Amino acid sequence: MATIEINYHNIKQNAINLKKEAKDIIAVVKNNAYNLDLKECVKIFSEAGINYFATTKEEECKIIRETLGEEVSIFLLNPTRDFELVRKYNIEVNIANLDYLKENIDELRDLTLQLEFAGSMRRAGAKTLDEVLEIINFCKENNLNLKGFWSHFSFADEFDGFYEKEKELALKVLEEALKIHDFEVVHLQNSASFLRDGAFEKTTHQRLGIILYGALPYDVKQYPVALPNLVIKNPITVYGEIVNIVDLKEGECIGYSNAYIAQKDKKVGVVNIGYGEGILRDRLRGNTCIINNEEKDIYATMMSHLVVEISEKEKIGDKVFLYDDIQQLHDYVKYFGPNSVQLAALNYNSLNVKKIY
């Protein structure tokens, strides 16, 4: 059975290293902590000194509270109408827009609120500076507890000029908002924004997700980094093993629909891992794996198997690594998009899971 090793010690060290660079951290733990186990991750983040968490689901807020107790702050990124739950578990609520406030004012009077500026993401929040100011004034007039201001950059991992524009707008809106309200918490930056710019002066926290889990949000070899001393450790190792060695004659094929045709007589390895384990096909097709510390081509991909290049020294039982310290998750962003796509796809029902502390 193919194996995934999750190194929680490395995730904790990432949190420690990031805390040294940030003003303070709100750890994003949405979708089961990027599919790396919500309870495990919030425990180690808490041990690393992080006491503020954000997620998109009410049920995950409940789990965080039950796991860590009353000493931590929890922010629900999505607007909610489950006011009974957020009240019971002391969850901070996101303001969807001015209408949301007006429609639910009686439910919101005893809750803690955060104001989102929609920016260019536009999933929720105030769309204009005027709406931001209206919301602030509405909260003041109605004695609502407005604690935070936040936004989310949709172009922070792009280097085509759009990020600079959305950043400039968000900072201008924040500057105007601060003239009429003293926010206890201000968080604008995600992992990519923080990595390329460092901490913004007028923020109190950096809201970090993917970088906590060991994946860099863009190609740091090609694009600038504002945190040159930051060390991020890889927590994910995924491997199968060679379960059969097949001799192919020149012109013979292996796999579905002539997936690979031998150009000469050769041996190939059959490996007990495929896209059924949640490894994205774009990661596999035309790419490489590591066997005995050497890079080898992947010839064919199947749901439960790979066919890979081998030499005479490879043997049945040898491990075949798809993700490790040599080939890390972020090395494949150019093939399949955000790192979170791969993390979310991992199929733990088909993998032997080893946890390292």
Put a short name on every predicted segment.
Residues 2-6, 10-13, 23-178, 182-185, ...:
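Active-site-proximal beta-alpha core segment in soluble small-molecule metabolic enzymes
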Residues 160-264:
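Anionic-ligand-binding alpha/beta catalytic cores of soluble enzymes and soluble regulatory domains
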Residues 126-127, 196, 243, 310:
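Short beta-strand-to-turn element immediately C-terminal to the catalytic PLP-Schiff-base lysine
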Residues 245-357:
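C-terminal accessory subdomain/extension
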Residues 1-3, 133, 137, 224-234:
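Short aromatic-glycine motifs in intrinsically disordered, low-complexity regions
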Residues 31-32, 153, 191, 210-211, ...:
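Active-site metal-binding loops of divalent metal-dependent hydrolases
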